């Protein structure tokens, strides 16, 4: 009878000895995936055995990942009752079934009440159905250079939301492009806007980043780049900008918008497929037909399509500048509305001034986007904001690059001063309490690192809000 590690050390070549063709193809293999805890027991022995018997190395690269631990950093062990069955995460499990599974077969049965208490604390409603793709994405995002992975189901919940976001984005695109002219006729006129060109630039940069991440075995970087592009750029910005173009653009603009929507999405599904294969395959089967990639009756799979390759020709620097200005202006408008407590349903006028003629010309072309995303009644361009400021108004001004922005609203100075003073007092009180906590040695010693980090983050956020409120108060005219 052979020792476990001895027989395991023979794996790279033992099944290939009688097949010379397979021997030449598969030895050495490209990469071995393993954990650092068995480097000596298995990896080193495979190298030694394979070199001794064949004169070759067993594999070209070794990808070493961290050990998966529970949310508190303890090593997962069935006998300790802190393991999680991947199927329970994928399919979901109720609390009682989870407790029963994790308190059965414990190495120390007397610990069952402790295990049960922890489970009921961490999973009071059991585990929601996460799905296979969301779990895969979670593990890819966790694959950092660290030696340990403290697995938290809440993070997997976040990636389930990401998969839902991709699904809903695809529904929106199909709803707006199916049965319509998507620019598949090369002779049809198309007018690509700055947002159309910008989203292609963002996609190409993401392709470059993801491919490099895969080449470097940085699955976390690949997952984060895909997440950022889909959620932050494509969904949060381009889909919203495309609505303006579909509603207000001429026929050529609408055609170009539909073409951009569906082609960028089709390529994005290819990009994300290695990490989330099931949802991307399902969506691609519909998107690829509309994008003209395959016919409706074909049985092609996304799995065998070519992977996106970086194309620098699609990176448009001028479009990037224009859209980044637009995004900054929209963010500033939203901050102004929030700071002045303007209800989301209320449309108000905006005044914009700039001394740069070229910048002003660019901004004037962005008016439809500003009105829609900023929920504005109109956009007024002026050389001096004071000429359009309502008499006695204390409306604040936001500065974005070469632009000054002001909502044309009459503000009750006395009421605004009172509101800001109360908010400043509240924030100062919160900051004082946080500083007392963090200066308490007992708290810092005994509190979990996560709690301390949350307290520091809350303190930094409140300090930032305090500075902003004081700045607004200082800008109010004196009575």
Regions found by a protein language model. Give the residues of each.
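Feature 926 captures the class I aminoacyl-tRNA synthetase adenylation module centered on the KMSKS loop
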Residues: 1-5, 10, 52-132, 154-479
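Extracellular beta-rich ligand/substrate-recognition surface
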Residues: 19-23
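The substrate-binding groove and active-site-proximal loops of carbohydrate-active enzymes
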Residues: 28-38
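Aromatic-rich carbohydrate-recognition surfaces in CAZymes
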Residues: 36-39, 94, 127-128, 134-140
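A conserved hydrophobic secondary-structure block that centers on an alpha-helix together
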Residues: 145-146, 217
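Short, solvent-exposed helix-loop connector elements
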Residues: 147-155
């Amino acid at each position: 009878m052979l020792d476990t590690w001895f027989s395991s050390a023979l794996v790279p070549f033992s099944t290939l000895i009688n097949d010379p063709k397979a021997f030449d193809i598969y030895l050495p293999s490209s990469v071995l995936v393993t954990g650092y805890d068995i480097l000596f027991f298995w990896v080193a022995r495979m190298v030694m055995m394979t070199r001794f018997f064949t004169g070759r190395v067993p594999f070209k690269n070794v990808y070493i990942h961290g050990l998966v631990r529970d949310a508190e950093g303890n090593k997962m062990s069935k006998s300790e009752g802190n393991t999680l069955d991947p199927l329970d995460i994928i399919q979901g499990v109720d609390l009682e079934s989870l407790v029963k599974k994790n308190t059965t077969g414990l190495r120390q049965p007397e610990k069952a009440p402790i295990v049960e208490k922890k489970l009921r604390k961490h999973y009071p409603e059991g585990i929601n159905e996460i799905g296979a793709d969301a779990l895969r994405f979670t593990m890819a995002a966790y694959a950092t250079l660290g030696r340990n992975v403290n697995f938290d189901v809440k993070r997997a919940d976040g990636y389930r939301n990401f998969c839902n976001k991709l699904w809903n984005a695809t529904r929106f695109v199909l709803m707006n492009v199916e049965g319509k002219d998507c620019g598949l006729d090369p002779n049809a006129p198309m007018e690509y806007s700055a947002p159309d060109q910008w989203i292609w630039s963002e996609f190409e940069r993401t392709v470059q980043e993801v491919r490099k991440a895969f080449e470097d075995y940085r699955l976390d970087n690949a997952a984060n780049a895909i997440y950022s592009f889909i959620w932050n750029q494509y969904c949060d910005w381009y889909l919203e900008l495309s609505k303006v173009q579909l509603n207000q653009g001429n026929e050529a603009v609408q055609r170009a918008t539909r073409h951009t929507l569906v082609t960028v999405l089709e390529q994005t599904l290819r990009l994300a497929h290695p990490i989330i294969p099931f949802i991307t395959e399902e969506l691609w089967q519909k998107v690829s037909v509309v994008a003209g990639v395959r016919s409706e009756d074909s049985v092609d799979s996304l799995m065998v399509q070519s992977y996106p390759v970086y194309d620098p020709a699609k990176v448009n620097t001028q479009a990037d500048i224009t859209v980044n200005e637009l995004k900054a202006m929209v963010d500033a408008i939203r901050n102004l509305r929030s700071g002045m407590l303007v209800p989301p349903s209320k449309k108000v006028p905006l005044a914009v001034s700039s001394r740069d003629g070229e910048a002003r010309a660019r901004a004037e072309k962005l008016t439809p986007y500003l009105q829609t995303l900023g929920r504005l009644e109109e956009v007024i361009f002026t050389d001096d904001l004071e000429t359009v400021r309502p008499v006695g108004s204390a409306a604040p001004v936001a500065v974005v690059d070469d632009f000054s922005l002001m909502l044309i609203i009459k503000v009750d100075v006395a009421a605004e001063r009172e509101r800001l003073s109360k908010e400043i007092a509240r924030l100062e009180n919160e900051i004082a309490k946080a500083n007392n906590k963090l200066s308490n040695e007992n708290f810092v010693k005994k509190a979990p690192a996560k709690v301390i980090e949350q307290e520091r983050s809350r303190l930094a956020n409140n300090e930032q809000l305090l500075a902003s409120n004081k700045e607004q108060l200082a800008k109010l005219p004196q009575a």
